[in-house]
Amino acid sequence: FFVEGDPEALLMLQINAHTEEELEKEIVSLIKTVEDSGLSYANATLVGDNIAKAIELRKAGLGLLGNIVGDMKAVACIEDTAVALSDLKEFIAEFTLIMKGYNQKAVYYAHAGAGELHLRPILNLKKSSDVALFRNITTDVAKLTKKYRGSFSGEHGDGIVRAEFIPLMIGDKNYELLRRIKSYF
């Protein structure tokens, strides 16, 4: 209902304003910025019920992207990284290079305005070679996230998959301090 053509990506922005005039001014400014960038060929302004439809589309997006037919799946191992907005462009570029280095593709999904990234490599975990890639990609992205002083668990907990990377992310001394605190409970 608002997507034109076959885009490589969608970026949805929400603009809030106190008056219709302020809103219109913000929309005109944003559209001009997007057009001047040359990075987008389409822009749609949604109002009314279409806003709710777009939000539902966004909510369904990760499920749709993760529902790949066959043994190749968008796997959860690095899906909760977060970096500062000022580092987002460089982080994504380096992440893309990591994936190219492994000759792999990934699903890119994000709350970009918050720097929260839901990146999922597409792997076949029935193959031992892809299980090894799962581990290598996770390790490389943990190091990349650390390089940008980001969080490897920006929205959710560390869990089984990311727990081993806590010392890397917070340092051995801080990790040992946390272990000592936990031992008291």
Describe each PLM feature range.
Residues F1-H111, G115-G154, G159-F185:
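Noncatalytic alpha-helical scaffold of FAD-dependent oxidoreductases
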